[in-house]
């Protein structure tokens, strides 16, 4: 990378930094040479009231999984049966983190993680589907950065079972957003943006039930007092039914064959100005904050998968007989 490109990338990253952060950071203090044990111990315990909410809901989740979700069928066919989706929507699984005033369940992040753990222990495809929808999909950036009008327009739809996706990565752009090629050009009257570009590796985007996408795109550069310009990345809610939105390819994988991960193109898509989340240039900050929630959801699901592995191993070592006894009784395993 040449010096100019590096400077632009650094300026963009600094401009996207979450400057309004008010809490003391444990990691930042470590780098300063101060080990703030009080920031991590004692670990905050879930309140009895909140835990009961989670306990009661997990009973409903287990019933839906056992009655309506066949993980083997989903992985073999690569699709989610309509009956399974209807059952999940009926108990609010698509709106766990959406506030109650917008039709969701308003769960704490702890209960959300507990639910993902249970679903992950049962069906990895399903937990990926749900997590991508509300950990990094449209509900999360709207919760944190959306206007009241945006929340009332979209969150009830998403809580009822409409699916969303998140579009950041491009064929030539991954961790370097300064090179982003998707562009949102404002119209002369300022009432809309014209969106053009390509995105890939977007989970849920090729699912026909996905109606909304959080899209990151370049908007006009920000000019500094010294005359230099910084690329602006902004975030928009885009409806898949709008003219010019085309889902072009669904990716296939060795595992998780049920996830609808793929590519989407935008050709002269007219996006109303009121569909921008946050302010111009805040898109990268919004994306990073949104991805942080995804980084909590994924390990919660992975813990569930690990628990399922342990259960399977325990069953096997107690049922598999070798040399006159279960293999779990042999010294190498016991």
Protein language model regions, located:
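Short helix/loop capping segments that flank catalytic or ligand/cofactor-binding pockets
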Residues: 106-107, 175-177, 203-205, 223-227, ...
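A gly/ser-rich beta-alpha-beta helix-loop segment of oxidoreductase catalytic cores
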Residues: 163-186
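Short beta-alpha junctions and helix-cap segments that line functional grooves
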Residues: 154, 169, 179-180, 200, ...
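A short core secondary-structure module
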Residues: 192, 196-246
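Amphipathic, small/basic residue-rich leader segments at the start of a protein or domain
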Residues: 1-133, 140-159, 163-164, 175, ...
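Structural beta-strand/beta-sheet cores of well-ordered domains, especially the beta-sheet scaffolds
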Residues: 162-164, 180-182, 191, 211-215, ...
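Short Gly/Pro-enriched turn/cap motifs at secondary-structure boundaries
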Residues: 172-175, 204-208, 226-227, 253-260
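Glycine-rich beta->alpha junctions and the first turn(s) of the following alpha-helix
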Residues: 246-334
